[in-house]
Structures are given as C-alpha cells and as structure tokens.
Curated annotation (Swiss-Prot):
EC number: 3.1.1.-
Cleavable signal peptide: 1-23
PANTHER family xref list: GDSL ESTERASE/LIPASE EXL3, GDSL ESTERASE_LIPASE
Protein name, as recorded: GDSL esterase/lipase At5g45950
Organism annotation: Arabidopsis thaliana
Subcellular location: Secreted
Main location group: secreted
SUPFAM superfamilies: SGNH hydrolase
Glycosylation sites: N37, N132
GO BP, one annotated term: lipid catabolic process
Family note: Belongs to the 'GDSL' lipolytic enzyme family.
Amino acid sequence: MLLVAFVTLLVAVALQPLPSVLSLDVHLLRQLAAKHNVTSILVFGDSSVDPGNNNFIKTEMKGNFPPYGENFINHKPTGRLCDGLLAPDYIAEAMGYPPIPAFLDPSLTQADLTRGASFASAGSGYDDLTANISNVWSFTTQANYFLHYKIHLTKLVGPLESAKMINNAIFLMSMGSNDFLQNYLVDFTRQKQFTVEQYIEFLSHRMLYDAKMLHRLGAKRLVVVGVPPMGCMPLIKYLRGQKTCVDQLNQIAFSFNAKIIKNLELLQSKIGLKTIYVDAYSTIQEAIKNPRKFGFVEASLGCCGTGTYEYGETCKDMQVCKDPTKYVFWDAVHPTQRMYQIIVKKAIASISEEFLV
C-alpha cells in the first residue's frame, strides 16, 4: 500500500524528450557503463521499484489496472504504481537498455536476464513483518529469488561470466516508508516492542544487514534511496485532517535517512562496498515547497480521483488529471514519473561520478 521513495524514467518510447543537460549526463553514463562492463541492474524494495512482481502474488497490493501505466509504453498497466516508468527503468534507459522487468514476469527472456531484474514487491520494507502484514515479499524473500536468478544466469552464460556480470552490476534498494506507514504506526506489534527512536534504530540494523547480505551475494556497487517526506503524502494529510505536511512523520523519515547515510559510510569504509545515497526526501520536499521551479502546478493532491485518498485499488478506473507532468503525486501516495525523473537526474550524476571512475 503506502510507499514511495525515490526515482524513475528516461528516454522511453512515448515519453517527452528529456532536457539537454540530462541528455549529457545520460551520454556520459552510457560511455562509462560500457567502459566498466556494467550491463545489469538488480533491484530490491517496495512499490517505488516494483515493476509488477505483485501481479503474481496473492495480495491486494497491485497496480496492474488503469489508470496506472497510462503514460507507460503503449499506455499499458504493468503493475507499476505510477503513471509511467519507475526509477530502475529510467536508469536502464540511460544505459541504453529496455525497462527493468519483474523477475516473476512469465514473458521474461534470456536477454532480459542478462540486463538484470527487479525482485521488489510493493508493500515491502526492511522489517520482514511489514511484508507479512500485506502478504508480499519481504527483503529476505526477494534475496532468495535473487539466488534463483543467479542459478538461471549461470546456466545461461556460465559460472565465470555470471559472477563477473553480478560483480559489475548496479544493485539498488528502495524501501522504508511502509515500515512506518503500514507497520509501526498502525500495527501494535512493534509499538509494544519499540519506541519510535528504537524502531528507527532497529530498521537501521536491518538495512545494514540487508546491504551486507547483497555484498555477500556479489554486490560491489549499491544505490540506496532514502525515505521520502511521508508527512507530505496526500493520503497522510487527508487521514490527519490537515492541508499542510505532517511534521512528525517527516521528522521520522529525516531521522531514518540519517541512519541510512551513516550505514552507507560504514559499508564503504569497512567492507569496500561502493555506495550512493539518493536523497528523495529533499528533492520531493523542495518540489512541494517550490513546485513552479520544477514545472509543477499541483503539489498537494494526487492526479488520480480526488487526489486525497485514492491509491492502489481505490484508484482503479478513476478519472485522472489532464496532465500528470504538472503533478508531484500520481495517486495519494506515489509520485508521478515526472517527479521521479527529477530525482533520478541527480542519481545518474552520482552513479557516473562515484561508481564509474
């Protein structure tokens, strides 16, 4: 359900041309990726990066129906909880590849496998209990499916080439919002165990553990997207009965992101894992405070339905705004692809500077 966090899209068919400055960033990234044999992107997380795995899971956390996907290739709803592409698709396009597929997609080809896959599941989080609440894949389950991916890839290209491809891949993690919005703040299990501060620390340890697990499985480059300003989601403001952002939730997100940043510094210094932090929080917050700076006209409501509470099933077959590119939020929880595009521009620059030098 509730989820947001970080990035999306690029030079896709049926999408408007990108700004020239971004095209320059893309050109550099493509050159460097080829130089360093970065041929795949491997994705873990929640709805911010799930291209449709949940279509094949018995859960209500889906987006494989209109109006989702109305700006995707051929206007097709794929399971992405957005009007178009997600961040991993965007980064893949920047590297010259098609959108990143869901690992469970039955149409997955051998060529797709060599370019990576997403194991993400909408509704998931760092806390395995979060996934259990919505009956979706926990990070642990996602990692297990990644092991299946490695087996398939090894059969396809051989053990040496498979190991090389995984070592050269860009790993991406994007989750955390659901741990608070779907779990701690609405379910009493964790509240009985932890204060908010203690739960943030608990999630920080889980995030660190997950990153180390990916490193053991072959990750050398890891991108982690921070939690967005949860208190600014239209749904949260609607439920709290206020028009302005809920400061308490934004402070929780800010505090957790600070822990993520420290963890990434630790991973880099202790085990040599190259890391990049994508600051979705600051970018989205800036767009909400100064929408016209980014070409937006609506930063408080979602594009779907009334824009106050609709997301997932409640957004199904609803009327949408005429121009999603003018909106920060697509539904009452998830950003538009235009908002993701703005975030990813920074990510592409960081990937070029930090990973591929």
